[in-house]
Each structure stands twice: as C-alpha cells, then as structure tokens.
Amino acid sequence: MKSLVIAEKPSVGRDIARVLNCKKSGDGCLEGEKYVVTWALGHLVELAAPEAYDKKYKEWKMETLPMMPKPFKLEVIGKTAKQFNAVKRQLFRNDVKDIVIATDAGREGELVARFILMKAGCRKPIKRLWISSVTDKAIKDGFSRLRDGREYDCLRDAAMCRAEADWLVGLNATRALTCKYNAQLSCGRVQTPTLAMIAGREEEIRNFRPKSYYGLTARTSSPSLSLTWEDQKSGGMRSFDRERMERLLKELRDQPVKIVQVKRTPKKTMTPLLYDLTELQREANKRFGYSAKETLNIMQRLYENHKVLTYPRTDSRYLSSDVADTIKDRLAACGIGPYRKLAARLSKQTWTKKAAFINDAKVSDHHAIIPTEQFVQLQHMTVEERKIYDLVVRRFLAVLLPAAEYDETVITAEIGGERFTARGKVMRTQGWREAYETSAGTDSGADSSFLSFDDLDDETDEEEERGGAVRVKEQTLPDVKEGTVIAGAGLSLTEGKTKPPAPFNEATLLSAMENPVKYMESHDKAMAKTLGETGGLGTVATRADIIEKLFSSFMLEKRGKDIFLTSKAKQLLKLVPEDLRKPELTAEWEMKLSKIAKGELKRDAFMGDICAYTEELIGEIKGGEGTFRHDNLTNTKCPRCSKRMLSVKGKNSQMLVCQDRECGYRETVSRTSNARCPKCHKKMELRGKGENQTFSCSCGYKEKLSNFKERRQKEGAGMTKRDVAKYLNKQNQEEKMVNNPFAEAFKNLGLDKQ
C-alpha cells in the first residue's frame, strides 16, 4: 500500500518526488515504491459562484440580495479541471491507503488541499507535512515527523470560515453597490480599508498648512565647530517665534562661546531583524523601485526554481531553534563570490539558541527568509534575482555579527546664557555593518547598489518630519576641554518649514497595511493587539495582489512613485457602508478566526454572526441616498454598444472602458513599456494599434514600432524580433486578463483572502 502526497505546485511536487525516489511518471503524478506524489496548481477548487445555487443569480438584481447559501457548494476551477481530475483518480486508487497533505504550511495552504479532498469526496486518513523550505534536507526531515491530519481540523475550519465570510460580504456588497449605482464597484474587508487609509493621507496633505520655524547656528573657525541652538525648556532645536530668534541673534552676537560639557557615551546599534516578505518588499521598492508583486514573483523563483531561499510568504522575522542548527550549512551554501570571505569567517563561530534572532515563540507557520543549504550558482540568476538574493544573504550575514559599537560625543556650550550643542560619532567596531560594506568581498559580478549602513540605521521619523523637528547634524568634532572659551563665533539665523506627510508609495502602503492600528477609530486594545499579531490588513501572501488589483480595477493610479486614489475610489468610499472602510472589521474577524484555529470557538457561531452582518450591510446599501457620477466620460463611442467610453488610468496603461457594465468592452490607448528612449533614457509609452504602434517619450521623441525593432537589432542589444513579439504578446495577455472588468472583479473577490 502507498501514501498519496498532494503538493501545492508542480515544482514542489517534483522536489518531493525526487527526495522520496518517485521516478515513474503517471497520470499527473510521480510514483515510487511507498509514495505517489501529485500536485495542485494553487487552488483547484473554490467556492461556487452564485448562479450555481440558483439561476436567478445570473442576473444582477437588487431584489435577489442578499445571497445566503446553505450549505456552501464547491466547484472545480475550469482552467485547472484537468489536473483536479488527475488528482481525484489518484485519490481513489485501491493501493492508496492514506493522504499526505504537503501544501504550504499555513491556513490557505490547508484550504487548498482540504477543498480538493472535500470536492472529490475522499475520506481516507490524512497526515500533514509541515515544512518551511523545499530543500532535500527539509523534505527528508519533514517526512520523518509527519503529523496526524486531525491536528489541523481546526485550522481547516478557520480557513473555510474566512473563505465563506469573504464570499458573503464581498459578493453581496459588490452586487448591491453595482446595482444601486449602476457602476462597476467592488469592495471587501481588506481592499476598502486600504483605500480609506490612502484617502485619509490625501486629506491630511490637502489640509496641511506649512508653518515657518527658526533656529540659530554658531560657527567657530579655531577650533572648527558648528553648534546648534537648543531651547532649554523644551529641548527642541527650533522655535516658531521669529521675533524671539531675531532678538537672540542680536543679543548673542560677538558673545564668547564657553564649553560647559563634553560628554562621551559608548553606544551600540543592534543588528536589524531578518526579512519577512513585507519588509523585503518594502526594501526592494525603496532600493530598486520593484513593486510588491514583482518582488514576490522574484522571491518565488528563488524559492521554487533556484531553491536558494526559504519560503517567501512568511510574516516572521525570527528563526526557530531547530533551524539554528543548520546555520553553518547555509553559510557554506551561500559563501560564494561576494560573500565568501565573511561567510567563511562566520562558519567558524558558534551560536547559542539564546541569540536575538532565535525565538520559537515568534515563529508560527514559517521562519524568516534566509538562504537554504542549496548550492548557489549566481551566474544562472537574472539581474533582478541577484539583487533580491543579495538583500537576503547580506541580512542573514548581518544578524550573525555583533552589534556595531561607537562613541557618541555631545559638546554642550553656552553663548550669553543660551545653550548650544554639537554632536559627533566615532565608530569603534563595525559589527554587523561589515555585511553591507564592499570589504565583505565584492567581485566583478556583484551588484553595486547594496544597502549602506545609513539606509538601515537612519530611518526618518515621520512625525518629526511633519512637526518640522530639527536634528543636530553629526560632524567630526575637535578635541576641546570643558571650560574652554572660544571667541569670534559667527551666528546665523536658520529657517525652515514644516512638511506635510508624504503620499503613499508601495513601500509605505505595505507598512500601513501591516500596521493599520493608527488608522483605527476604535481604541479597543484587544483589536489593536489582534491586528498586530495577525499582520494587519491582508497577509504577507496577499498584500501584493491586493495592491495590484486595486490598480487594475482603476481604484488607484501612480504619479511617479506615489500612489493616489482615482475619482472612482473616492466616490466608492462615500457610498460604501462605514464598517467596510475600517480596519476594525478585519481585526474582529481575525480575533474569531484565531480562536477557531485554536479550537476555542465553533465554526457555526462565527458564520451565524457573519450572516446577520451581511443582512444588515445589504440593508444599509439599499437604503443609501448617494449617487455615482462618471467624471471621466469621453466623446469616444464604444464599438459594441455605442455608449460613451470612460478614460481610465491603470498602473502602467491608459485605457478606454465602456461605461455599461454589461458590455464590458475596453481597449488600451497607451501603455508604459520597458523600452528606453535613446535620447533621455526614460521609459517610453507604446501607443496605437497594429502596424501603427508608436513609441513615445515625454521628452518629445517618437519612433514607430517597426523602426524600433530594426534599431534594436542593429544595436545588437540582444532583442530580436521574436523578443519584441514575445514582450508585446505578454502585454496583450495582461490586457486580456482584465478584459472583462465584471468577471475579473468578482472572480477576484478572493483578493481579500487571508
């Protein structure tokens, strides 16, 4: 008799099959003496669409709402039906005695496998593989300690509750809003609060009124010293009272400088934490301009294809004690090229399980992202993969190094009874900073855009920026003694203005989604704690998709790197019920889902509350008195229905979309390409259709697509006609993916998945 192993993806299935010596190819599987390994393609089964319950739901009508299925049905996803049938045949083989769930170790991974088993009607015994990386060693260790599947029944219940609750609230609210206002409007408990946070930031910026502030600087030439005035009452370095500062300037001029204190304090900067996915996405956006989705895709390749990094969709920044035992193996694997010298030195050390980066209590499903024990071939990676790999390896090396130590010197002086200070820093030991220096051993193939110490250690406090706080700039300080009197200081008045909060970009929006507590109106400490523990709005696995889909549904637009709401999103926030705009809804759900996963709350009790809430929500939408106005109507008529089309701006394209939701026609007017302008090297837009497609740059340069192809070939840039065609085909496929805005909106209600 054999065990059937169900992996989440083919690549993981093949890795498991290789380790288990399953070499015989079968019907959507690989087979060995003891195991048969098959795989899903992500989700193969999902909750059924409304029309599966009643034909009346095919038409979107307010009178059919709310839709309340009892029980919920499952349906096979059409495009993956072939693989589902292959898995089902393996499930019911006479020689298969039990099932090993080897999908991702987490709530959604559990749901992938359980939905398959439920839809297939398979009731064979279940075992669970729970691992954080797919290296051979991790797989072997995992199979040596398989767990009873019944231990995860509560996790399954929590996953099903999350899916069903999102279906009830998301689909019903979206249909109600769309029918009520005759516009393509979708909402959900994650995407809508995300929009509300951006709206709040935009309002802060609109309402901001800059205030001028003033300070004093005293400079001496012998010794060379720059001193900053400090308010003796508040300790601040600036004042909003110009008259006071001008008066002080006159009073203190030509007064001697007396050094009253020279204080040297030994200090440390602790090692930064390891990366979880959100922190890595933030860093990649800040350093390289990668979107959250791009970073996740790159990470996925490094995890699945290269197998050099651990599981990417983690929300932990720590390692478990069992993983700590493998550090030397990981150093040996990543200790090549630019990391060789430092990795070799570190491999001679030992680490206790009391190290700051080891904390079993802060690792749930998966530990932080670190290198695997797999041998690395940097030459097989793309430039983008190298950059992300470099971030992770250097952070891994950094946490194995001690704190950076330095002496901070603060000179306090008096001029006419007023206090002035100067600050300087002298490094004593580099500590973890060594991992971010070229002295770690870069080679010709290494990317030059590594993080510097300042990038990591000098995070500007947003509240200080808003308030116009002034920091004393560090400088190389002269050797002066207390009691020294210096004559001839030059005083000058400094002036600045308070700054508004910056608009969100992808990095800061990810931070806000991860920590939305300050955007909560409620002061409920339990809710705030839950949002903190569960990772805020969405999960590390879904935030990138949520942001991307808000762009594709024309709720967000980019101006440079900054993100802004479209008119559509602003109107939606006025029309949607207040509950759906608040992070508190997610916090409340997560508190209950966490209890379900622990066996402390029954599934039926939670779903009863959700059904009641859905009824209340739809009633509120039905009774709404607002209106929706298309303020982006053009004079271009839809070629299908002749109605005027809407001009909409996506993340990387300008489009015309039919205003009639039933028609759904759309066409691309222009899209940002990766082709660079030969004059100014900015990215060019591709406009037009067919043979008339033309690249256009903001500097005024234009070039037909046909000429572009010829030029690229002549330049020997490595882009053939086939490459260009492949690129354009990819752009077209992306366009097709959103060609039916209605189908997309509701198919993707899962964008609120946890």
Language-model segments: residues:
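C-terminal or mid-to-C-terminal helical accessory/interaction module adjacent to the motor/catalytic core
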Residues: N94, R114, A138-T220, R264-K268
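Conserved short loop/turn motifs at secondary-structure junctions
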Residues: M1-K2, A102-A105, N182-S186, R264-L273, ...
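Intrinsically disordered, low-complexity regulatory segments
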Residues: M1-A163, L456-E459, P500
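Metal- or metallocofactor-binding catalytic centers and their adjacent structured scaffolds
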Residues: S239-L273
